Design a protein with these regions (language model features):
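Bacterial Sec-dependent N-terminal signal peptides
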Residues: 1-25
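Glycine/tyrosine- and acidic-biased, solvent-exposed loop/turn segments at the edges of beta-strands
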Residues: 19-248
Length: 248
């Protein structure tokens, strides 16, 4: 299953390197921003507003949707290098929260759906994905957990059915499929079991029916089929066409 991609479109847009000077905004003789600053769109609606001191953002910066509702709030540290961020859905519910360190996500970031249920948890070190990332179903139940190392998936990744039972267990190394993989039916019985090598199927892959009987055995060499055995002759042609795709 493709990992859910949620709420990442805001991020770096909110830092001072995206500020555009308006006529009413003040710079001193050294060209440094001072005091209240505000950016307006062509219709005169506020895009963001905040305070500067010696070119350093101070306190709370607010960003707005076109209808005037708050889109995000960033609260800066005194030196302007860190900012605690809260982003909002158009309905006013919290969308995301976390910290920026020098314009990069840092530490734990949490994301929420419009019902205020948790939808994802991500960890960063200076913008680099690390630690266990988690995504959730709309009701807040865990959908997937995947470890990251140096910005890439690394280790055992698990997906779950909505009732909490395991749906799949797959290993990654340096961002690629590597090692054992298994995909399960909701009752815990195996659906598909095999191995990966350098992001490709390698070795024996066994597919099962829901009753536990073997459906096929397919042997791969670096992603290329070298041998096929089908136990259900009535579905042999169909299965050959499918080659038992990895479940989403």
């Amino acid at each position: 299953m493709k990992r859910l991609k949620l709420l990442t479109f805001i991020g770096i847009l909110f830092f001072t390197n995206s500020v555009f000077v308006q006529g009413q905004n003040i710079t001193d003789s050294k060209g440094m921003k001072q005091g209240a600053w505000r950016k307006l769109d062509a219709a005169g609606k506020v895009i963001y507003e905040g305070q500067f001191k010696d070119n350093i953002p101070q306190g709370v910066f607010r960003y707005y949707y076109e209808d005037g509702k708050v889109r995000s709030e960033l609260t800066y540290s005194p030196d302007g290098k860190k900012a605690s961020a809260v982003n909002y859905h158009p309905n006013g519910k919290k969308m995301a929260e976390g910290v920026y360190a020098e314009t990069k996500k840092d530490g734990l970031w949490k994301y929420y759906n419009e019902r205020e249920n948790i939808s994802a948890e991500e960890y960063y070190t200076k913008g680099m994905p690390v630690g266990f990332w988690k995504t959730y179903y709309d009701d807040g139940n865990l959908l997937e957990e995947c470890p990251y190392k140096n910005g890439k998936k690394d280790g055992l990744s698990k997906q779950y059915f909505s009732d909490g039972s395991v749906k799949s267990e797959v290993n990654f190394k340096n961002g690629k499929y590597e090692g054992s993989a298994r995909y399960l039916f909701p009752d815990g019985k195996p659906l598909l079991v095999g191995q990966f090598k350098d992001d490709l199927k390698h070795g024996l892959w066994i597919a099962y029916k829901a009753n536990g009987e073997k459906e096929s055995e397919i042997t791969y060499f670096e992603g290329v089929i070298s041998e096929e055995i089908y136990y259900d002759k009535t579905r042999e042609a169909e299965l050959k066409n499918e080659v038992k795709e990895i479940p989403e």
